Amino acid sequence: MNPFRIFRQPNKVRHALYAIGALAASFAITSVPAIADDSKQLGKTPVAIAIHGGAGTILKSSMTPEKEADYKSVLTQAVQHGYALLQKGEKGEVAVVETIKILESSPLFNAGIGAVYTFDGEHELDASIMHGGSKNAGAVAGVKTIRSPIEAALLVMNESPHVMLSGRGAEDYAKENGLEQVDNTVFDTEFRKQALDKAKARMQQVSSGYGSQQGNERFGTVGAVVLDQGGNIVAGTSTGGMTAKRYGRIGDSPVIGAGTYADNESCAVSATGHGEYFIRYNVAADICARMKYQGLTLNDAANTVVNDVLVKAGGDGGVIAIDAKGNVAMPFNSAGMYRASVDINGKVKVAIYKD
């Protein structure tokens, strides 16, 4: 099933088609065969990819086998599609965007269709992308009418002199450059509406009000990091933000250095979690800096920041990271993180909980 055909259907039909497609694909999840990698024989840089669909309070007790299969189905589809593009020689930024667009098209994840609601019942979307070779980056924040926020972030990176555009200005720029515009209701889902109602009820029960909500509504992001045949590493992130957010709140996802960062001399990182902490501790860039200036391995740098720095600060979440050799790290300090990867040998990994 082509996930992008879903876009042309009315909301109810689109969601029904997605559910059928996801269920059909779920039967192939339990054992994912390795993908042949011919890059070594061809003398090219081996390629690799890692993706995430958000971290947070993902309790096994509330996860049915059918629902888990649906999540893993979309993760598998996305990571294999991105890997196939890399094998064909596509640039890293193309693979990142096309991979994330699959996740943005799924109502399961908090990005694009399926994005959470603001306090006022709308969707405000953020995304960013960064190229580790050129250090070019692009981001959009608080957009409501752009079909694919990650595509808009790529447009900002490639075609504008800026790094970040926000709100109506970002929407106008995307429209002028031919990106698809949609009504904000395209991103509606009943599941997220119920989450908004629960968040509002919780906020009314505590004296601190706004910002006091706990649970899954604090989390939710999608992202991808890749190593392409040119030896470049690229990172991208897209999100609907925090459920019941107000006042134009922007999290870490569109902030270069916090939710997204890439440097060929160290690593590429896409983050997910409690965004305020990721901004304050500059999480994505910190991981890369520990590799570049302290000589830490990718795994040590990522684990130190996620499971030491963030934990001590009180920040929950995780990251996916990749270095110029194709090593992948996917640490998280929450109950779970939707994630998948294909390494330089073509080995596929799809997981939700701790190994």
What are these regions (language model features)?
Residues 36-355:
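Alpha/propeptide regions of enzymes that mature by internal proteolysis
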Residues 18-30:
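Bacterial N-terminal signal peptides
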Residues 5, 32-36:
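Short, low-complexity disordered leader/linker segments with a strong preference
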Residues 2-20:
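Bacterial N-terminal signal peptides that target proteins for export
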Residues 9-12, 23, 32, 343:
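Short linear sequence elements within intrinsically disordered, low-complexity coil regions
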Residues 8-10, 29, 189:
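Polar helix-capping/helix-linker motif
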